Amino acid sequence: GFLSSVGNGPGELNRWPYFSGTSVHGDTVYMYDNMSHKLNAYAVQIKDQNLTYSFLGNKPTRENGDGLPEGVINQMAFELVRLENGYSIGFRVFSNGTIFTLFDKDLNEVKKFGEYLVDEGLMDGEFHQSICFQGLRLSRGNSFFYAPHNFGYMARYDVSDEGELSKVWERWYSEPSVSVDNNNLKFEADNPQGFYGLAV
């Protein structure tokens, strides 16, 4: 079966969701629709090696994550980037000042990291737009490379076999030109673009 329908007409999702999560017990899957700001819930059951699921409903959810069901875990966007030692890094959709989450080999959260790429003076407690910092994320060995689309910035992090995270280097290639209006990050007309291609 299908978890959802996609399109501009009636359906559970208006576009492909970029948020997913599971309940602590793994019996419920959540998918977030960015266009409608609704969180769709599905009951999941595995029996005789078959996966079945049913739509439970949806509820409005604020962009900062308020309204998420208690116990939702594995909050991330797009694909996970997996390192050679089994650790993974996911881009955070709902966050408060950090961009990434480091997961262990069993996809349990280890820590959050990666500060927002704008001056802290521009932000307040209601600013949660981590999606503005999305970009290219690649791995090589146990190294993780990040180059955002909207900022002339690049960074490399290493993760040890014990899960210790270290920033090896970061570089700014251009000065961003941004402002915050009504808690929304605004890129000015003269803001230099970041990266849309990266190879390691």
Report residues per predicted region:
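Beta-propeller domains
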Residues: 139-164
